[in-house]
Amino acid sequence: MLGPGTGAYGYLSGYLDGSGKLVKLVPLEIDRDTTTPVEVLDGEITIDALPVPHGIVPALGFRVTVGDASIVFASDQNGSSDDFTDFASDASVLVMHLPVPEEATGTALQLHARPGRVASIAAEAGAGTLVLSHFMARSLRDLDANVDVVRKGYDGAIVIASDLACIVVTD
């Protein structure tokens, strides 16, 4: 994929060896079938990753922890994993995608969670603030109605993500 000259993203090949003034990335393999978080970074900031269900397309959720505060990025997922709900437990901020409406069917549900499921994950996890992101045309058609579904199932603060928005994270 990143091979110089032949890869679909060949222009990014410098990330593999640090050439072209790009930061060298060190790939970390995470088994898509693991049900326990994998530590990606440890130090003043800790980052853990967990595979999340997104049809046949691999996806990872991330938990970033600084002191007592944490932000969990749900990533693209269909919301069917109790392991993820545990992973997101007591997050200061939970960022979840809202790309499909409540009435979505078929393939969309293999990839994405309905608004009601987004709400139940946030509520069960005890998230402090829920940030809704990754809107698609089908969820934007009636964004207010989709957010209302989330509000019915989640009592905490809800933020509609927008580019360059700043969200205060407290512990």
Residue ranges and their predicted role:
Residues 30, 50, 75-77, 97-98:
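Fold-independent oxyanion-binding glycine-rich loops
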